[in-house]
Swiss-Prot record:
GO terms for molecular function: ATP binding; FMN adenylyltransferase activity. Keywords: ATP-binding, FAD, Flavoprotein, FMN, Nucleotide-binding, Nucleotidyltransferase, Transferase. PANTHER family: FAD SYNTHASE. Its cofactor is a divalent metal cation. Homodimer. Its EC number is 2.7.7.2. It is an enzyme of class 2 (transferase). Catalyzes the transfer of the AMP portion of ATP to flavin mononucleotide (FMN) to produce flavin adenine dinucleotide (FAD) coenzyme. HAMAP family: FAD_synth_arch. Pathway: Cofactor biosynthesis; FAD biosynthesis; FAD from FMN: step 1/1. This is FAD synthase. The gene is ribL. It holds the Pfam family CTP_transf_like.
Length: 142
């Protein structure tokens, strides 16, 4: 059995998230999803939806076998539980594949890291674009 790990914030679920998880799932038979903690997100605005609610939404997706929250202290801690064979990164995730693989190896993991290519194309395949659309609509209503 090949264990796959996908990670992300998953704030305001949209078709881009589903596409990422469906593509990640193709790399193995068991898909684990690590949902980022509110306190650890630094490379973009803090999520609108609280972490426990985001986790609940991800768990409800048919493509996902297991979902868990990340660690606030050590991003590698949940990997001890999951023991992934492959980590699949989305096109826009901030990690460098080789650098992450090296860090994993130094911690005793024999995990391959792959990055998906082109993102799913749709008008609102971005939490940021969804928020922007809501704000624009709200302004026109005022």
């Amino acid at each position: 059995m090949t264990r796959i790990l996908a990670t992300g914030t998953f704030d305001i679920l949209h078709p881009g998230h589903l596409y990422y998880l469906e593509q990640a799932r193709k790399y193995g038979n068991e898909l684990y999803v690590l949902v980022a903690r509110d306190s650890t997100i630094e490379h973009k605005p803090k999520p609108i939806v609280p972490e426990k609610q985001r986790l609940e939404m991800v768990k409800a997706l048919r493509v996902v076998d297991h979902a868990l929250l990340g660690s606030e202290e050590d991003m590698f801690k949940p990997l001890k539980e999951v023991q992934p064979d492959i980590i699949v990164l989305g096109h826009d995730q901030v990690f460098d594949e080789k650098e992450l693989e090296d860090k994993l190896q130094k911690r005793g993991f024999n995990t391959k890291v792959v990055r998906l290519g082109k993102p799913h194309q749709c008008t609102l395949c971005s939490s940021g674009r969804i928020i922007k659309r809501i704000l624009e609509r709200k302004r026109t209503e005022l």
